[in-house]
């Protein structure tokens, strides 16, 4: 059985913990998009692990991991995560696969990201994702496949860096050659072609791990305040590099809403209310450390994300954060009364709220009513509920 896990908001929904928990039911966890701009935190009890590139498998159970063609690899980050994997999980014996078609984020991409965001004010993570994607489309970027071939690596680096000089950005190609060659030595035993990866995964039960959230998807998110890649389930096959059969799509959402960076946010709470929610949920980015914008759950946006990503079942996270709130609001529609089929004018939307009595614990009837309401409004069952920070704090409904 193959399943996909996607975020249904603007990322940070808790997908990492959910994927790690669900990986016990699968042979392998595969990343199909994103880069080091993603941050997945998993609390194993005695220690926490934050992954930006490695798939969020349960390494205590030796689940395999695969990185597809659509993932952008930051050499420094991946090297550190592989080192940490050996250090924190010394008995790990799972298989590791990296597609040779995956592209590499270069130091020049991070500098370009910084320069571009000063002008566009998108609020990126400055991890070089956008510029790397642009170079990929322009066919001047370095892939994993080029790292083991000095002649090809030099060719692509020189082409790439010559274009950057237009922007006044200059990097040492020879130093970059050396760094990338060292990186290749670290990963070369894991590198496979897309055909090889396809054959391997066809024999496995695979959990495909999405990054960010549907509302940050390049094509169907809150453009231009989006990431540079596909975050919905439609990106799985393209991101892996071959057609993928999927049996179930699981959509993860918080019991409230958060967002990092710029862009429309109809239910955003400012002032004391927003700060209270931020502190209760420890809402600070795992990649940037920036405080997240916080607001109430937005059902029109949730329904939009569910439909556009073909979600079958739901996973609710951080419901425990709302423990002790006297009243809890949920946006049930917008004041214009229209069905949300486009995010084009989202910044003009005014939320209409339904107010729920709060709960002191997730055993309260009030919480049960809250979950029932969401299931009715979305037409999807809530299959799992995250009840705390630790990996095992998940209830199968």
From Swiss-Prot:
One Gene Ontology term, aspect cellular component: cytoplasm
Residue numbers annotated as active site: 12, 40
Catalyzed chemical reaction(s): IMP + L-aspartate + GTP = N(6)-(1,2-dicarboxyethyl)-AMP + GDP + phosphate + 2 H(+)
Record-listed IMP binding positions: 12-15, 37-40, 125, 139, 212, 227, 290
Gene3D superfamilies: Adenylosuccinate Synthetase, subunit A, domain 1 (3.40.440.10), Adenylosuccinate Synthetase, subunit A, domain 2 (1.10.300.10), Adenylosuccinate Synthetase, subunit A, domain 3 (3.90.170.10)
Record: residues binding substrate: 286-292
Pathway in which this enzyme or protein is active: Purine metabolism; AMP biosynthesis via de novo pathway; AMP from IMP: step 1/2
SMART domains xref list: Adenylsucc_synt
GO terms (BP aspect): 'de novo' AMP biosynthetic process; IMP metabolic process; SRP-dependent cotranslational protein targeting to membrane
Cross-referenced Pfam families: Adenylsucc_synt
Cell compartments where the protein resides: Cytoplasm
Cofactor note text: Binds 1 Mg(2+) ion per subunit.
Presence of keyword Isomerase: no
Function recorded in the entry: Plays an important role in the de novo pathway of purine nucleotide biosynthesis. Catalyzes the first committed step in the biosynthesis of AMP from IMP.
Subunit structure: Homodimer.
Protein name per UniProt: Adenylosuccinate synthetase
């Amino acid at each position: 059985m193959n399943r996909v896990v996607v975020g249904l908001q603007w990322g940070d929904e808790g997908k990492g913990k959910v994927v790690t928990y669900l990986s016990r039911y699968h042979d392998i966890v595969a990343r199909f998009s994103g880069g080091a701009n993603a941050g997945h935190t998993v609390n194993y009890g005695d220690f926490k692990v934050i992954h930006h590139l490695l798939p969020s498998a349960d390494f205590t159970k030796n689940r395999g991991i695969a990185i597809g063609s659509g993932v952008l690899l930051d050499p420094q980050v991946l090297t550190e995560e592989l080192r940490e994997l050996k250090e924190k999980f010394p008995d790990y014996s799972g298989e590791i696969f990296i597609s040779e078609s995956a592209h590499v984020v270069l130091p020049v991409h991070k500098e370009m990201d910084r320069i571009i965001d000063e002008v566009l004010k998108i609020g990126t993570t400055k991890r070089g994702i956008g510029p790397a994607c642009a170079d990929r489309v322009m066919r001047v970027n370095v892939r994993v496949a080029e790292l083991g071939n000095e002649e090809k690596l030099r060719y692509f680096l020189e082409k790439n860096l010559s274009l950057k000089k237009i922007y006044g950005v200059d990097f040492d190609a020879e130093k970059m050659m050396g760094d990338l060659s060292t990186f290749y030595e670290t990963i070369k035993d894991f590198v496979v072609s897309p055909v090889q990866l396809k054959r391997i995964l066809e024999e496995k039960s695979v959990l495909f791990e999405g990054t960010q959230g549907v509302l940050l998807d390049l094509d169907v998110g809150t453009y231009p305040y989006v990431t540079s890649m596909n975050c919905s389930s439609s990106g799985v096959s393209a991101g892996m590099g071959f057609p993928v059969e999927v049996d179930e799509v699981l959509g993860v959402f918080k019991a409230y809403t958060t967002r990092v960076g710029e862009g429309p946010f109809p239910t955003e709470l400012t002032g004391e209310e927003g700060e209270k929610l931020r502190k209760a949920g420890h809402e600070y980015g795992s990649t940037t450390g920036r405080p997240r914008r916080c607001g109430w759950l937005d059902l029109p946006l949730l329904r939009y994300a569910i439909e556009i990503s073909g979600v079958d079942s739901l996973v609710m996270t951080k419901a425990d954060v709302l423990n002790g709130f006297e009243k809890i609001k949920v946006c049930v529609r917008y004041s214009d009364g229209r069905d949300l089929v486009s995010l084009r004018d989202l910044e003009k939307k005014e939320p209409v709220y339904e107010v729920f009595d709060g709960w002191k614990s997730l055993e309260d009837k009030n919480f049960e009513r809250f979950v029932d309401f969401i299931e009715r409004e979305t037409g999807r069952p809530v299959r799992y509920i995250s009840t705390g920070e630790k990996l095992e704090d998940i209830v199968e409904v």
